[in-house]
Amino acid sequence: MGVTKKPDLNDPVLRAKLAKGMGHNYYGEPAWPNDLLYIFPVVILGTIACNVGLAVLEPSMIGEPADPFATPLEILPEWYFFPVFQILRTVPNKLLGVLLMVSVPTGLLTVPFLENVNKFQNPFRRPVATTVFLIGTVVALWLGIGATLPIDKSLTLGLF
C-alpha cells in the first residue's frame, strides 16, 4: 500500500481553493479543462502517431497466397483455443463436448462462492480457490500441449 499525502487543512492557500470549490483532490486542480482539453488529446494523438509510425516504418507482411489444393493434413486453431480444441477432439459425443466447454466458465463463476473470506487476503489462506486455480492451470496446459500432438498421443502427451 502506498503512502498517501494528507492535505494540510491549516494551509491558507488550500483553504482558499476549498472555498472556491476546487478541492476535489489534494492539489486543487480540476480535471476540467486542464486534463480533458489539453493532456488527454496529446496522449491520444501521441498513441495514434506511434501506431501510424510503426505501421509505416514496419508494415506487416501479407503471407503466402492461399492454395485450396494444398491444405495441411491437420488444421490447428490459434494457440489460445488449444484446450477447447483438445476437448472437442477427444470427447466422442458433440453434446458432451459442448457441455464440457460450458462447464469451464460455469466452474470459474462458482470459485468466489467456495470460500467465504475477504477477497484481499493471502492466496494461501484460501486453499480451495488456490487449489481450483492450480488444477485448472495444469489441466489447461495439459490440454493445450496435447492439442498440438497427433490424436493417438494427445491424452498421454506421448509419455506412456
From Swiss-Prot:
GO BP: any one term: photosynthetic electron transport chain
Keywords: Chloroplast, Electron transport, Membrane, Photosynthesis, Plastid, Thylakoid, Transmembrane, Transmembrane helix, Transport
Species whose genome carries this gene: Hordeum vulgare (Barley)
Top-level division of the source organism's lineage: Eukaryota
Location(s), subcellular: Plastid, Chloroplast thylakoid membrane
Gene that encodes it: petD
Protein name: Cytochrome b6-f complex subunit 4
Major location (coarse): plastid
Xref: InterPro entries: Cyt_b/b6_C, Cyt_b/b6_C_sf, Cyt_b6/f_cplx_suIV, Cytochrome_b_C_euk/bac
TM segment ranges: 36-56, 95-115, 131-151
Lineage: Eukaryota, Viridiplantae, Streptophyta, Embryophyta, Tracheophyta
PROSITE patterns, A to Z: CYTB_CTER (PS51003)
Pfam families hit by this protein: Cytochrom_B_C (PF00032)
Subunit structure: The 4 large subunits of the cytochrome b6-f complex are cytochrome b6, subunit IV (17 kDa polypeptide, petD), cytochrome f and the Rieske protein, while the 4 small subunits are petG, petL, petM and petN. The complex functions as a dimer.
Misc note: A longer mRNA that is not produced by splicing has been shown to be transcribed in barley and maize. It is not known if this mRNA is translated.
Entry keyword annotation includes Plastid: yes
Example of a GO cellular component annotation carried by this entry: chloroplast thylakoid membrane
Membrane topology: Multi-pass membrane protein
Biological role: Component of the cytochrome b6-f complex, which mediates electron transfer between photosystem II (PSII) and photosystem I (PSI), cyclic electron flow around PSI, and state transitions.
Annotated family: Belongs to the cytochrome b family. PetD subfamily.
UniProt-recorded Gene Ontology molecular function terms: electron transporter, transferring electrons within cytochrome b6/f complex of photosystem II activity; electron transporter, transferring electrons within the cyclic electron transport pathway of photosynthesis activity; oxidoreductase activity
